[in-house]
């Protein structure tokens, strides 16, 4: 999938699009750097000997979000000199607010700072009510719903007083800014192409941002695999990729990447059989030109040491 996206970017550049008008979104800094390197290698082999200037708008959703927020801060009532809290700093601030409310003592048995931050983060990224998030994901915290609501309100106020944003705010504030039609159009018009890697891992906020930037889908390319959506516990929403084509009129074109380069056909046969059970999915039949007569084995081991010993012995 990633190689497909890199070739797409290289093709766009080869067709004359300036790299500064390409927005490429990934889920890690390392993935963004790898994407840049792949694009450069592909263009270096081009018959015209093309080279690409630095893809200045390639990065994670959060990094790009921070950059846009600093640039458009005054348009949305934000101080551009805001500081960014990492997860540890955010948890410490949450704990400070817990302490002010008298909820940090062992006797209170109130959720830990890490759990509180996880609940808050889930409500923001999943765009779900607190009650729903607690009931479905953190049911052991149901008795504390009112206290959590007060805590989160105070946490937000503390961030505003200190002119700082946490990682979730980097998405939330951009999504809110892009809900202003003229601002979304202005930002969207800066990019002829927006490309997203691992789209099955996006959450509701990220999908909102993309659809606001390119509401008609022009120049929008996403790559992903609905069968690899395994980050629901981090608020990833598989419906983002399943519903992507129908957001547009006419519907987005779906290109199926059915060839697998890593596995042998017996492994893919097993994978195809499992994937076929899904009630809703994009139809694809994975295949490989790597033949093998050996079928996958189901092996039961006692622990990780036994597992490692078995694998090493093979």
Predicted regions and their residues:
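P-loop NTPase Walker
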Residues: 1-80, 84-85, 91, 185, ...
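Short loop/turn elements that form and flank the Walker-type P-loop nucleotide-binding site
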Residues: 18-19, 52, 188-190, 215-217, ...
